């Protein structure tokens, strides 16, 4: 049976960054790997960040959001059937940062997928700089995306103090308890380490972490009602202006509650990936990009967002 791994994590936690390392590690073991990248909204920006995986033999398939649950499940099912028929040995699924994992497990239980796929690992990425307070819907997503994890990886540990790392662990435990989930993570199940320092032994342990069955009390809401994505195409703004103005979006209540900003900008003939949360902004060079900026959050005001960006 094809092994299928799930890499979860809330918006901006660092799933795509870890996914690149994880999929490349499996390819280095001689395993034929395919990544199924699922982004929130109608434009899949994260897929462009995985271009370099093709160089190590990893194939990438994508599903864009922006549709109802039934349509999304149908698209995912179709992709998984196609990948199984193409002979991949391992499929790594990265859902969006706003994702009900029950939807994924429901798809895996359907015929013929239940005969072709076996759940391998569930890995949850949690930001070491996780905000102290989230909305009830965001708290539920944090808990439900982590409950089945065989291993939790704290991201951005190199930027966090020991107190912040402990605070992220406590926050996760609190979110799980609020959802009436019995899942508790022991010290050996949480890896708090700069990813640049991950060893081959670390990767082998992560790749064998498995999963734990757990359940959370369901919080019923429509992801696309609770969370929104706003797209800006061909803004024509410089990298310097975007880097200066994007951080202000997170503190401006008139913009709504901004959770993440991501996209691309060209500067001097070089494309850069912009990725921002309330904890900070990064700009990393990439081979190719497109003039798009996506803001994800709650109660967003597009006109106000654009006004702030163009200041």
Please give the residue ranges for each predicted region.
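Nucleotide-state-sensitive switch-loop elements of NTP-binding domains
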Residues: 2-13, 17-135
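Short amphipathic alpha-helical segment that frequently serves as the phosphate-/nucleotide-binding helix
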Residues: 16-20, 139, 169, 243-246
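A general structural signal for short secondary-structure boundary/capping elements
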Residues: 80-84, 108, 137-140, 275-280, ...
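Conserved C-terminal guanine-recognition region of P-loop GTPase G domains, centered on the G4
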Residues: 83, 98-184
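C-terminal accessory "lid"/substrate-recognition subdomains
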Residues: 144, 148-154, 158-289, 300-303, ...
């Amino acid at each position: 049976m094809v092994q299928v791994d799930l890499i979860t994590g809330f918006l901006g936690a660092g799933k795509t960054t870890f996914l690149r390392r994880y999929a490349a590690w499996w390819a280095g073991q001689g395993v034929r790997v395919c990544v199924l990248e699922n982004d929130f909204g109608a434009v899949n920006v994260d897929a462009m960040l995985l271009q370099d995986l093709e160089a190590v033999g990893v194939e990438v398939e994508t599903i864009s959001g922006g549709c109802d649950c039934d349509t999304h499940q149908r698209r995912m099912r179709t992709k998984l059937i196609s990948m199984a028929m193409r002979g991949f040995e391992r499929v790594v699924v990265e859902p969006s940062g706003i994702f009900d994992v029950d939807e994924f497990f429901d798809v895996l239980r359907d015929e013929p997928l239940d005969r072709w796929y076996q759940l391998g690992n569930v890995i949850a990425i949690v930001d070491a700089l996780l905000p102290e307070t989230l909305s009830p819907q965001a708290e539920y997503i944090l808990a439900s995306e982590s409950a089945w994890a065989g291993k939790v990886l704290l991201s951005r540990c190199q930027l966090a103090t020991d107190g912040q790392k402990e605070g992220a662990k406590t926050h996760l435990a609190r979110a799980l308890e609020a959802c009436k989930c019995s899942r508790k993570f022991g010290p050996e199940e949480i890896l708090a380490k700069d990813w640049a320092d991950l060893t081959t032994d670390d990767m082998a342990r992560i790749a064998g972490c498995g999963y734990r069955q757990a359940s959370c009390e369901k919080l019923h809401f429509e992801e696309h009602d609770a969370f929104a994505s706003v797209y800006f195409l061909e803004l024509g703004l410089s990298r310097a202006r975007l880097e200066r103005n994007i951080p202000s979006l997170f503190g401006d209540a008139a913009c709504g509650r901004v959770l993440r900003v991501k996209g691309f900008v060209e500067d001097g003939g070089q494309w850069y990936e912009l990725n921002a949360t309330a904890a900070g902004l990064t700009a990393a060079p990439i081979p190719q990009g497109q003039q798009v900026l996506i803001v994800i959050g709650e109660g967003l005001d597009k006109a106000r967002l654009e006004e702030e960006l163009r200041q």
